[in-house]
Amino acid sequence: LYKVTAFEGMKMTLEGLKSRGVKLAVLSNKPHEATALAIKGLFGEQMFDVVWGLRPGMKRKPAPDNAWKIAEELQVQPKDCMYIGDTNTDMQTGKAAGMYTVGVLWGFRDRKELEENHADVIIEKPEEILRIQEGRACSS
C-alpha cells in the first residue's frame, strides 16, 4: 500500500467544500484498490462522491477520458469543475478535459512545472481552494 498522509488543512477544506454542496472526486493513476483504500483510510467513505484509481482498460492521465466520465457521473459540466493537482500530468489532464486547473505547491512538484503546464491558478495552502470555489460554479 502506498504511504500517504493528508496535508495540513486538507480535511477542513474538503469538509468546507462538502458543506457548500460541492461534489468531490479523486482520479489517480495508482491502482484502484490502493487508491480507494488510501482515501477511505484518510477521509472515510462519505467525503468523496467518486474515487477512481487505475483499472484495466482505463486510459492513464493525462488522457482526459476519465475526468470526463467522472464529471458525467456527477452530472456536472467539465467547464464547471476544478481539477486540483500537484503535477504536470494533473494540469495536462484538467486542461485537456476543459476544467479549471488549480496547481498546488504542497505536493511533489514546484511552481515552475505548474506554470509551464498552464495551471489557471497556483496555490500554497488547501484553504485557498475555498476562496477559489466561492467565485466559481462548481456545485449543482
Task: Give residue ranges: language-model regions.
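Short, acidic loop-to-helix structural element flanking the phosphoryl-transfer center
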Residues: 1-26, 32-36, 64
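Conserved Lys-Pro-Asp/Glu-containing loop-to-beta segment of HAD-superfamily phosphomonoesterases
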Residues: 61-91, 102
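A short, structured active-site edge motif that brings together acidic residues
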Residues: 45-60
